[in-house]
Amino acid sequence: MCCVLGYAGHDLSKEKFTELLMRTASRGPDDQRVAETEFGLLGFGRLAIMGLTPEGMQPFFRGNDCVVCNGELYGFRPVKKELEADGYTFESDSDCEIILPLYYKYGLDMFNHLDAEFAMILYDSRKKWLIAARDPIGIRPLFYGYSESGHIAFASEAKNLIGLCKKIYPFPIGSYYCNGKFVRYCDIADTPAYNTDDMDTTLTKIREKLVAGVDKRLDADTPVGFLLSGGLDSSLVCAIAAKKLGKPIRTFAIGMSEDAIDLKYAKQVADYLHADHTEGIINKEIVLNALEEVIAMLGTWDITTIRASVGMYLVCKYIHEHTDIRVLLTGEISDELFGYKYTDFAPSAHEFQAESQKRIRELFMYDVLRADRSISVNSLEARVPFGDLDFVKYVMSIDPARKMNIYNKGKYLLRKAFEGDWLPESILWREKAAFSDAVGHSMVDDIKEYAESYYTDREFAEKSGKYAYCRPFTKESLLYREIFEKYYPGQAEMIVDYWMPNKAWPNCAVNDPSARVLKNYGDSGK
């Protein structure tokens, strides 16, 4: 991960701007640079992944035009060769150096030509345009706000803008900002028509496109590792990578000392793949001590995001401190595409698809936010193969009647697509467990118990009543909200709501986001 920061004004000192940039120094620990430009100030913190030489440091300039990008542009080398044939020259092996020439070639339509995850700020000196843009899923974070003097600012994280902007907003996904306006260039969740592929073709395309999504994310000039929970999604990513690389991959799992579900299944997968596997063991004390740090780095008050981030943050912390790995592949975004436990209760195919679209459009506030912050705060880069644009577009084009749980097994199409020698049958067809549960049922119970003892009933009633927006409804949610407000005062509206199952559906009127409370959880998490 890297950090970008831009301010469209000349009333902010370079020293203050640098202090704002350095708040997220862990995103870009290798080097930091602040440039004074025609429009204002532009900053970049580098985590070198592609093109490791000093020439790969941003901002990239061509004349007075400039760009900073926290991103990964997949398949950039053939594009670079085409640009070289057009007469452009390059000084580094960085993928992001091709952005300005691409902009010259395509203009604002450039964003539709990118197979990438990115958050960028670009200045066109000829047109005097300040442009910012974000990828269609929002895998790379970007926020914006306005200073007291009315100047717009863009930043990788909300914490970069605290004190500069009164209100901070998530930059809309699949959109660009130009000349004072936001424009949606891609709604990846929108499906004008479903494809007509038969079942065999559908399964083949699911497999081939996910394999391609993993393969392109193995391209790095630094060591690559894998988060392995032992669940279907992360196990598939690891299995594909192991086949592609043809050598032992490095996998990491974490679990509570008492009842970690993940560790058992992760070891089964690692042994099957002959992986170089590392286990991390945590306990109640470690979890509770990490809680405030986790919420501060996340910038959310959402219950399930915080719960699931604790284990992820701690395993990434271990990887940062004990290995040379810089890139981590993860299994996020499969649930939004193929269904959660609660989507078993979808009343119709239409509602299943609408729910999937909603979840994809909100990913940047929940699972994607969790993966980005938990990994980047530890100076690592997250790559999410299930978020591959070609893969997402295809899966969203599958008739939802096929994706619903009509087979008595969730994610049937994904499982069926990888039958064979990819994974042990016991893993391929294993029921889903919530990540925070899989780390250990006791982890969530420990946090709840702590919150219950932290507030009396009277204190809970008084303190939760202070919040008109998304009022905390349990002592656990109040604990999270109070810590959030300590670090992000008045910014609660960055998150639209608590992540919960669709309460309008049968059997989904629950007040806890964990799949554990659903009546169809069954043997999940055992």
PLM-predicted stretches and their roles:
Residues 258-316, 322, 339-353, 373-374, ...:
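ATP-dependent adenylate-handling ligase core
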Residues 33-36, 112-116, 167-172, 219-224, ...:
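Short coil/turn segments at secondary-structure boundaries
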Residues 335:
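Cytosolic ligand/metal-binding cores
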Residues 1-300, 322, 326:
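Cysteine-centered catalytic environments shared across enzyme families
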Residues 13, 92-95, 114, 199-206, ...:
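Hydrophobic (often cysteine-bearing) scaffold residues that line and stabilize catalytic clefts
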Residues 1, 19, 324-330, 342, ...:
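Adenosyl-5′-phosphate
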